[in-house]
């Protein structure tokens, strides 16, 4: 990929997303699409009550238009992998939109039930995996970072594993979306990691267009989502991002890299699981002051901006480690 091929998707997506925000936020305010805040969260978060949600539509639009405008040559040549990744993420975005719509409609912080979300997400994951296998883009050879080796799995085992990873990733990103600018800031380095992969790894230029558009879209969204946020991405945005992260990892055929680039998502999710499990086992005791992890640090006295900065730095470190973990794969 040349310099312009790297930069252009970022810039175009940033501009489109920023413009979309100017139009979308007033519309969301007019429609009274305000976020309902959980009463079990930090009390000072109640001041965020009514902030427009579903803002993820901004970068979904920005990314979509960018890959159509800049990726049409690849599509004319019969290469659709970047479009598949986008459409897969979009399906999760639609699931999130339905959830957000239910919350806004009923003015409550509960939308779809956990079972409804799981069934829809699992169906989307299976459909994506079947499409990728049909197109010859999926392999049961599981790449192991650092060792530059593969574990050959039976197809059935691999597909079950892959579906679990996809649904888990999507929900982990969703859990991370709890502070102004947190999920978007943490995901920018991950998008950059996948963009770098497209630059150094011949044959993945199409994914570079999507990854660049993802980075630009998130930066455009942060114009409005940084503290104090004028808009939240909602489940519309967070489920889209989770779908995008999972789809990119499988499109590059290295899903285990998510352990490194998604270290923040994993820590957030584990803190939630550990807190709930320990609470039940000990009949009311807690390990963390509040879960997920970003709320724990808030309760320790950290400002939102500090939590976001530190978590983003951890994400950057995870992505740098991930680069060296897979370096041997493309350094031949």
Question: What are these language model-derived features?
Answer:
Residues 1-29, 59-97, 128-135, 156-332:
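Alpha-helical transmembrane segments
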Residues 25-42:
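Membrane-interface loops
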Residues 32-37, 100, 135-143, 287-288:
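Peri-membrane helix termini and adjoining interfacial loops of integral membrane proteins
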Residues 38-52, 107-120, 294, 299:
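Juxtamembrane helix-capping/reentrant segments at transmembrane boundaries
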Residues 49-51, 145-157:
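Short aromatic-rich membrane-water interface segments that cap or initiate transmembrane helices
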Residues 74-77, 105, 136-150, 330-332:
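Membrane-interface helix termini and inter-helical loops of multi-pass transporters
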Residues 98-106:
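Hydrophobic transmembrane alpha-helix segments characteristic of membrane transport
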């Amino acid at each position: 990929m040349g310099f312009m091929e790297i930069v252009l998707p970022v810039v175009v997506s940033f501009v489109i997303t920023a413009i979309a925000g100017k139009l979308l936020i007033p519309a969301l305010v007019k429609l009274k699409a305000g976020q309902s805040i959980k009463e079990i969260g930090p009390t000072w978060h109640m001041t965020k009550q009514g902030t427009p949600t579903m803002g993820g539509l901004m970068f979904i639009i920005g990314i979509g238009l960018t890959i159509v405008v800049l990726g049409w040559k690849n599509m004319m040549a019969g290469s659709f992998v970047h479009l598949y990744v986008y459409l897969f993420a979009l399906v999760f975005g639609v699931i999130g939109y339905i959830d957000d719509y239910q919350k806004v409609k009923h003015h409550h912080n509960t939308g779809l039930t956990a079972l409804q979300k799981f069934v829809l997400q699992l169906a989307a994951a299976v459909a994506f995996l079947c499409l990728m296998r049909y197109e010859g883009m999926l392999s049961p050879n599981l790449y192991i970072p650092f060792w530059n080796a593969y574990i050959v799995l039976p197809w059935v085992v691999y597909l079950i594993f892959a579906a679990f990873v996809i649904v888990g990733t999507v929900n982990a990103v969703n859990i991370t979306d709890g502070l102004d600018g947190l999920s978007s800031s943490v995901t920018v380095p991950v998008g950059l990691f996948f963009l770098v992969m497209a630059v150094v790894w011949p044959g993945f230029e199409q994914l570079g267009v999507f990854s660049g558009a993802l980075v630009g879209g998130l930066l455009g969204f942060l114009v409005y989502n940084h503290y104090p946020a004028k808009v939240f991405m909602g489940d519309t945005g967070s489920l889209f991002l989770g779908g995008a992260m999972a789809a990119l990892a499988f499109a590059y055929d290295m899903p285990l890299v998510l352990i490194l680039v998604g270290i923040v998502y994993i820590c957030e999710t584990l803190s939630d699981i550990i807190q709930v499990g320990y609470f039940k086992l000990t009949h009311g005791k807690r390990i963390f002051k509040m879960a997920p992890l970003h709320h724990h640090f808030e309760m320790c006295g950290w400002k939102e901006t500090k939590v976001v900065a530190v978590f983003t730095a951890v994400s950057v470190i995870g992505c740098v480690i991930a680069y060296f973990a897979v370096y041997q794969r493309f350094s031949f």
